[in-house]
Amino acid sequence: MSLLIRFAPPSLTAEQYDNAVRRLNEEGVFPADGLDYEICFGSGDKLKVSQVWDSKEQLDAFGARLRPILAELGIDPGEPEVVEVHSIIRR
């Protein structure tokens, strides 16, 4: 069963998001195994990120690599919302 993860950090700018993605790419862990989609949206310092994952195990493995990078960059991800996906419709 796929999972939808929704991050709504207290503050996240495009520059912070781009720096985190750059670091994840440098570490060779992004895009991660099991990550179907990542969507970043919003404006100013109120960006949000939604992801669709194949499994909780893959999400947890990625989270273990992500958390130290976010801490190093001073990004507080907040507490994500995690829900099971009922259906994904693609074009």
Predicted regions and their residues:
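Short S/T/G/P-rich N-terminal loop/turn motif that feeds into the first structured element of a domain
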Residues: 1-50, 54-68, 76-91
